[in-house]
Amino acid sequence: MAERQSASSPTPSSPPQQQQQTPQQPPQYLLNSKKNFKVKVLNGREVERHPLNSITKTEDTGKPKQSSLSSNASSLQSAAAAASSSTATTDIDPLNNNNNNNTDIDPLNNPLEKKHDPLSETIATMGGLKLIKENHLTNYVDENFMPWDTLKPSILQQYTSDDSNPIQVSFMSTGTSGKIKIPINRLNKILEELEQDKEDSKSTQFSQPDIIMDLETLHSELLKAWAAEERVRSLKIAIQTAKLLSDTSLIKFYPSKFVIATEILDTFGNLVYDRIKKRLQSSKESKNHEILLKEQAKETCRNWFYKIASIRELLPRLFVEISILKCYEFIQGDVNTEPKQVINRISEMIRGIGNPLVANYIRAYLTRRSFDLCPEYKKFVIQLLKDFVFTQKSYEKSKYLENTLSMYRITLTDYMGLYSPSLEWLLQCLAHKATPETLEEVLELFRESKNSLLLNHIISSFPPEYICSNSTMFSNFIKDADTLSYPKYQLYSTFGVNLVLGQPPKNQILSILNDVWKVVTNFENIKDYISVAEVFIEYVLTHCSEKETDVFLKDILRHIIPDKGYETIQSHLQSIVLKIFTHISDFGKLVSFTNFLPLLDLFNGESQKQISRSTLEALSTSKVMTSDPILINTFLTYGKALHDSLNSLSFQDEVRQVTQLVVNCINKIDFGRDVEKQLNFYVECRQTFINFDGVKNRLVYGVCEICEKTLNLVKGKHTPKTTSFIRACVAYCFITIPSIDDIFLKMNLYLVSSSVALQNQALSQADALLKAAITFIQEIPPILEFKQVKSTEDWTISYVSDFISLLVVTPGHPESGPFYLVKALYKVIKEYQWESSSTAKSKLFIQLLLLCSSWAQTSLPYHIEKVESNDQLFTEDPEFNTELTEFYNSLIKEILYDLNLLKDEPDNLTQKKVGIICIDLINALLNVGELNSKTASLIFNLYNMAKKIIPSTCFNEITYLKNTLAFIGTLESKMGQDIFNKLSQQQ
């Protein structure tokens, strides 16, 4: 104790006689009770877009978009560069060893000297049509055309023989890509097959991963062969790739195999075309040499086509020729080389392919590659479709279809679904910018065939406006279509998508719906029914009234409730509800639907969680406030379901999102002047969302708002009834706040609730809240360790300072006295585990000095209306003033004790903090204390300590010290001038 008293002396340089005091002497530091404060009075107060309209824009390079992939762009460039940089050493045709042509330049291997580009000036000299300009295809297609690259990922994802393993292809930039390690024995086998002279070698049946490995190898070897100027080997690789497309043993994988294999064929075709074109464009020689180059280009193309024509097997011959189809540009003028003639010839040759599935995919490949050559030419596509229909009819009459389904153990629906990608591409190319006559010709083809698969892709490919304007006709088409090639429910689903995207005639909207639903409502399979309903709910929401929407929901419930059929179609129901939320933003209007809430009650498990969240999102985005009991009950029901779906293992981000969602919903509930109902609602919310701190935080603030609203309603004069209500509100806060785990939320709520209780004259409850807040200060962690270590010292200082400001007007307890809360706070501050070298305790003790100064005044600087503070209760009491002075002196001693402990700390940061505390204490003493000899001596010593301890680099603190000295010089008292003169002499 003796050590403590010694340590609390002003400074080591204080005069000895000032430290030796007798118990009878009065305190040396006196409060000034005559400060002129300005008195203040505080008054209380998604249709998913149609699949053929989700368009990726064509690149603005002006060139037709090629199928070569970005991951191999550098490889292709290097291969082309190697091809164009080689030197001419032979006159032998690399594609025909028996060729005795006497030309000096090999059209395939011999590089051409750089010449002026003859194609850019006089392309007509090559005969026939002009070469397609680079921006021709770009100008032809628009946002309504879906590029092939957009279709590829969905094909690779959907068509696989092994659903558990996604297709991975290293050289593809679409879909799922990833490098695949190819076993060395597999690689050797493929390379050996390429070296065989016989072109009739057949590939052995392998698994899906094996086939992908084969294609990986073929692609890699193609690039290597081309870069090494091995043109014959490159052609053999293309042939080998095409042969793989004759195998349909893994029939479910065939569409994906087609996508991968044609990527390799595209690469081959582009390499051939780009090499010839680059050699022509790089030429800058004389006119005579320009003519020679044209002839060489023609000869090169002819040699490629002659060699391809010598392939005995029809399928690889067609695939490889189609891959270099664009090269016909260079030999226009020759016999039978006009593009349309070539395309027609190939389309007729496809009829020789025996497998209808393979034949249809080669039709799609022809359509795709010819689209680069002459996109406006569509007549041959109609003929291809006629061939498809004819083939289907032929095989339906024979045993082929039955045998195929039996061999591959596949259903008819699944088998016909394999044709979808090829048909979709055919019809898209045909329907894009097609004339009405072309569309009518396609429809006539359906009328003759009644093929439902064809009809499905007609509907999906034709413009939605065309479908809507002829909706009755298409509805009849669906009824007339056969049931073998494609399911009826999928036809109606595709039809519904177009009706949503377009605008049917107003006088036909209901008749179309009724006509369709007469058929759909009789579907026996609930999944077929709900698949159509999932699409047509958006049609009803878009084009029909709310009454029709409710009737439509009633029909859905009638189908799915018996035998608990809804349990197997949760995802479809969820999609229906989400579409309803998207189209009807007024949640109050939704709950007025007779059949909407019963639909929400059908969800369970994870679907219930998702739909509960969607329901709350719909409510939270409502633009109007509500007090509808049905809507509130809906909120509490689905809010509780969402609350109960989360636990301690849930991600904190998810908990925060749900909490904010619930808070947003609470903000939408307002009972106006009926504050009792508002409080009852908050009571229900607290019971429902007991685990959400953020919600409880909002509820406490909401109850405080109720108190303020009540105070305004009674104009500051509470009646016995409102007084009881206020007490109930404060009790709600007192009960709710301790249940919040977040200490920072908790502390703020205690402070706010205490203020509200004081404003509403609930003094005993305010006292209890303040006492609880003081107790919980000890639980504030000095350091937070979340993601990074962070000190809470600044927050704690700010909070306690606000708390002290409230204590200024808080009346003392009639039994415990005016100081019991202040002294309790003083004890908590003193015992709190502050960080080492912290001056926070001294800062707060200086705040308490200011509190003591306020209490020493005859009138406090501010008041709360209708609340008698300590200036009215205790100012005239001598015991109050004596105890106040003693407490004031004890605070100064504690501050000096801390300064003595910290002044010898070596680091500059602590030195700066100590210097600031010295200056703060000087200013506090000058402003609130009575300037006597004891105070003057303390100020003198504090100033010298600050001057000595503040580092020379701390310019702001040094300026603060100088300003403090200047302020002392403005004091009018003799004691103040003496201090100033004494300190000035030391400068």
Curated annotation (Swiss-Prot):
InterPro entries: VPS35L. Keywords: Endosome, Protein transport, Transport. GO terms for biological process: endocytic recycling; protein transport. It is found in: Endosome. GO terms for cellular component: endosome. Residues 43-63 have a biased composition (Basic and acidic residues). Its main location: other. Residues 1-23, 66-111 have a biased composition (Low complexity). Residues 1-115 are annotated as: Disordered. Component of the heterotrimeric retriever complex. Acts as a component of the retriever complex. The retriever complex is a heterotrimeric complex related to retromer cargo-selective complex (CSC) and essential for retromer-independent retrieval and recycling of numerous cargos. Belongs to the VPS35L family. This is VPS35 endosomal protein sorting factor-like. It comes from Dictyostelium discoideum.
